[in-house]
Design a protein with these regions (language model features):
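Bacterial N-terminal signal peptides that target proteins for export
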Residues: 1-11
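Bacterial N-terminal signal peptides
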Residues: 9-20
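Macromolecular interaction modules
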Residues: 23-155
Length: 155
């Protein structure tokens, strides 16, 4: 049941690819941010954190396509009120076949090559692909809106 929440976002991402919503050309590696929002089971936060910070990063970064990961905790200060999920894992994926990467994750969860924990309470997951390059405040200092747009587009 907990795995179902994790898999929901992968199905949405796969559908986006089928409908042609991902940028790029066939056979060209694309970059994705796979974001998993979750909580720890009540009374199991220590186990949850140990699993996520060690075992889960260990397992998923061994899957072809997964290139990096970063784990976050909800800040005490929020722009628009507190959120129900206290944790966010951002997985960076680079692949020309996202559905196959997610199929590999599902297969590994099913056969035990990727260890899961009963301390995980899924909220939701989503996968995003970039529209612009990453832009810093330093890059745009003194630039016009048009210049910033060109920087964001990588021109």
């Amino acid at each position: 049941m907990r795995i179902k929440a994790l898999v929901t976002g992968t199905l949405i991402a796969s559908l986006c690819l089928v409908l042609g919503m991902a940028s790029g050309f066939a056979g060209e590696k694309q970059k994705y941010q796979f974001m998993v929002f979750s909580n720890a089971e009540s009374g199991k936060e220590e186990s949850y954190l140990k699993w996520y910070e060690g075992q889960h990063i260990h397992d998923l970064l061994r899957i072809p396509g997964f290139v990096a990961a970063q784990f976050f905790r909800l800040s005490d200060t929020q722009y628009a009120g507190m959120q129900p999920q206290r944790y966010l894992m951002i997985w960076e994926i680079e692949t020309d076949d996202l559905p196959s990467v997610f199929a590999d994750v599902k297969a590994r969860l099913k056969d035990g090559r990727t260890v899961f924990t009963d301390a995980f309470v899924g909220g939701f997951s989503t996968t995003m692909s970039p529209i612009t390059k990453r832009v810093t405040a330093e890059e745009i200092t003194g630039k016009s809106v048009d210049e910033v747009e060109a920087i964001a587009k990588g021109k």
